Structures are given as C-alpha cells and as structure tokens.
Amino acid sequence: MALEKDEKTAIIADYQMHSTDTGSPQVQVALLTERINGLIEHLKVHPHDHHSRRGLLKLVGRRRRLLAYLASRDKEAYRKLIDTLGLRR
C-alpha cells in the first residue's frame, strides 16, 4: 500500500547517501521493501485480492532488479543493505 509522507521521509533519511539523495538504489530498495511489507499484511487479511497480489509481484521484481544492480556495482553496500533490511539472499 501507499506510504504516508512522514514514513517515507523517515525511510529516506535512514538510507540516503547525502542530504538530497532520494533516488539511490539503497533508498529505492528500502522504500520498496516497506511497500512490499504493507502489501503482504494486506494480503493476509484479503487473500483473494488478486489485483494487489499482482502489484506485489511487480514490486518484488523491481526490488530484485535494483538489488542485482547494486550487487554488481557495490558489493559492500549491497551486503549492508540486506543485513539492515533483513532480506534473504
């Protein structure tokens, strides 16, 4: 589901590389992870919501591609991000 403005600002502040960074792979993956977690909770309550399930799969795919990009560019940042977000890889 959509993130509230203050939640999004807090996530960006936690993962940004510099004061105006809003688009680095680390920030994007963190935001996608929060949206994915919200959709997972939604689907636990509404298991037949196939439209949201498709959106979840698209978000997971986008996050996977961003993580692959980050792993190819900066292995150390990739490992640190996975540890802080608690992702399996």
From Swiss-Prot:
<comment type="function">
    <text>Forms an intersubunit bridge (bridge B4) with the 23S rRNA of the 50S subunit in the ribosome.</text>
</comment>
<keyword id="KW-0694">RNA-binding</keyword>
<dbReference type="GO" id="GO:0006412">
    <property type="term" value="P:translation"/>
</dbReference>
<dbReference type="GO" id="GO:0019843">
    <property type="term" value="F:rRNA binding"/>
</dbReference>
<keyword id="KW-0687">Ribonucleoprotein</keyword>
<comment type="similarity">
    <text>Belongs to the universal ribosomal protein uS15 family.</text>
</comment>
<keyword id="KW-0689">Ribosomal protein</keyword>
<dbReference type="InterPro" id="IPR005290">
    <property type="entry name" value="Ribosomal_uS15_bac-type"/>
</dbReference>
<protein>
    <recommendedName>
        <fullName>Small ribosomal subunit protein uS15</fullName>
    </recommendedName>
</protein>
<comment type="subunit">
    <text>Part of the 30S ribosomal subunit. Forms a bridge to the 50S subunit in the 70S ribosome, contacting the 23S rRNA.</text>
</comment>
<dbReference type="InterPro" id="IPR000589">
    <property type="entry name" value="Ribosomal_uS15"/>
</dbReference>
<dbReference type="GO" id="GO:0022627">
    <property type="term" value="C:cytosolic small ribosomal subunit"/>
</dbReference>
<dbReference type="InterPro" id="IPR009068">
    <property type="entry name" value="uS15_NS1_RNA-bd_sf"/>
</dbReference>
<comment type="function">
    <text>One of the primary rRNA binding proteins, it binds directly to 16S rRNA where it helps nucleate assembly of the platform of the 30S subunit by binding and bridging several RNA helices of the 16S rRNA.</text>
</comment>
<dbReference type="Pfam" id="PF00312">
    <property type="entry name" value="Ribosomal_S15"/>
</dbReference>
<dbReference type="GO" id="GO:0003735">
    <property type="term" value="F:structural constituent of ribosome"/>
</dbReference>
<keyword id="KW-0699">rRNA-binding</keyword>
